[in-house]
């Protein structure tokens, strides 16, 4: 079974947030809203949830996932930041960007992108995500809720819930979310490189 809970993103009740966190702490997999569509979220040490995401989305086992963070302070605990990286991320977040950076040793192997030890991090501009991460008090591993069939671009939350029913533990329904990917920015080199154009503007280049 999969539970569905409807939440006002601008007025989530403490009991609702506690319930979501409880599902995560018990090893659950959730679907939740972000500023770039619905995403799947789980705790970084939860290998079983990661494997469920791979099956649900039909992904390669070497697929990389990103950390959903509450603040730049959380980002700094996961990746190595140069001064220029810090300034750019502070300028663009919260917002629809994912940044690729060298990971620190404490980053879960469930998230790392490659043997170079890089990882993706983002700070979504969504009130419910911010509230949830504050209560959870740790970043979430995250993956866009994209179904294996590229034609299944579902915007209605009831239809989306039906598609993932039985494959997740909790669907956090906060209504419509724009379905457009984050802008993917590689910060591992001397200059920022855009790996994917998405919802975030790139006039900072």
Language model feature labels by segment:
Residues 1-205:
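Active-site-adjacent structural elements in enzyme catalytic cores
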């Amino acid at each position: 079974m999969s539970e569905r809970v409807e939440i006002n993103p601008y007025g989530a009740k403490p009991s609702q947030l506690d319930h979501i966190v409880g599902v995560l702490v018990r090893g659950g997999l959730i679907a939740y809203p972000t500023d770039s569509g619905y995403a799947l979220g789980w705790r970084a040490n939860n290998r079983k949830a990661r494997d469920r995401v791979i099956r649900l989305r039909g992904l390669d086992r070497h697929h990389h996932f990103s950390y959903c963070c509450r603040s730049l302070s959380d980002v700094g605990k996961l990746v190595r930041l140069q001064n220029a990286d810090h300034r750019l991320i502070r300028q663009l977040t919260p917002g629809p960007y994912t940044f690729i950076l060298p990971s620190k040793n404490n980053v879960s192997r469930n998230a790392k992108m490659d043997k170079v030890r890089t990882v993706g991090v983002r700070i979504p501009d969504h009130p419910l995500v911010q509230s949830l991460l504050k209560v959870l008090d740790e970043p979430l591993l995250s993956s866009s809720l994209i179904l294996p069939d590229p034609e299944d671009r579902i915007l209605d939350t009831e239809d989306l819930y039906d598609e993932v029913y039985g494959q997740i533990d909790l669907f956090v329904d906060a209504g419509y979310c724009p379905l457009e990917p984050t802008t993917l920015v590689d910060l591992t080199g001397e200059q920022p490189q855009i790996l994917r154009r998405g919802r975030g503007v790139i006039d900072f280049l």
